[in-house]
Amino acid sequence: MGTIRIRTGVRSAASAAIAAAVGVATLAACGGSDGSAPSGDGGSDGAKSKTVTLVSHDSFNASPAVLKEFTKETGYTVKVLKSGDAGEALNKEILTKGSPQGDVFFGVDNTLLSRALDNGLFTPYEAKGLDRVDASARLDKEKHRVTPVDTGDICINYDKKYFTDKKLAPPQSFDDLIKPQYKNLLVTENAATSSPGLGFLLGTVARYGEDGWQDYWKKLKANGVQVVDGWEQAYNESFSGSAGGEKAKGDRPLVVSYASSPPVEVLYAKPQPQQAPTGVATGTCFRQTEFAGLLDGAKNEAGGKALLDFLISEKFQADMPLNMFVNPVVKGVALPELFTKFGATVDRPETVAPDRIAANREQWIQSWSALVVK
């Protein structure tokens, strides 16, 4: 499959908002201001190196305190190397296979997992504590080439004010979106260029099957769905319910985003509202799972294994929601109040097996593009 340009979605906006508070401090905790390793530890040069390099997409964030805790427990300092969006970062690792940029890769999700595995990017390693990870997230449980780290749900978000003002119930299912009362209300991202756009497409494949998803999209197109390149444009420009969309005078009260988007709207509003301005149609969700793996040819294999153990520790898992706006995969890790109060609980998300995605992804995207954006 060709290169997919992917926006990680809600975390892109969150990353910008917390860059000063978290991002700069993270670099300080991980190394020099340019992202280099602290002097004297030799970078990621071999078994004796005390630096372990984590290669990730641009939306990786962790609190400095948690990264310092890892150093305290293991003696290793984390160097974070951000390599673009998820698809771009994966492509770079494929191009440097065998001589990787770092020791651990974080951020490949279930829509692209097969590409990473088929290219032999990872050395198998069963992380300590993997038995505490929800079984549904362990998609490579036989070979342990990757370790599940987080989950998120791609769902329709709606502008509460719009539907209240119109005295119209917001849609709750895929079937609702093709009803005439929701004509010209939805904006989605291009499935060929956007992670949430692809996830939404896969959700319709799961819901309607190989024989029905194209007919569904014909009806959605006839009902006035708008398609834009990426999440940033859809959510922060076209969607009327977001702070950015309100400023840009967006006119679409329905958007493909994440179940964690409403808490983000609350967190960064000044003053914080008592209720989220947006809601989630929980019957339209596709489950996204992100993984990390020990890169084949890693210079600091021992450090990489220690980092994989830490990524599924309770300390790191509890730190993720307010830094990357994702859900922990370790059972029993509590979500922060912001999530439980303003977020949506998705009990039955749509899923597609990674091997099925691998066999059909290119064909699905090509068929979708010809049908919807031609």
Question: What is the predicted role of each segment?
Answer:
Residues 100-105, 123-160, 175, 185-191:
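A structural signal for short loop-to-beta-strand junctions that line the ligand-binding cleft
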Residues 31-34, 42-115, 237, 374:
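Early extracytoplasmic/lumenal segment of secretory-pathway proteins
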Residues 337-374:
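Extracellular/periplasmic bilobal clamshell ligand-binding domains
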Residues 292-351:
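Mature extracytoplasmic/periplasmic domains
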Residues 110-121, 141-169, 197-207, 287-293:
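Periplasmic solute-binding protein
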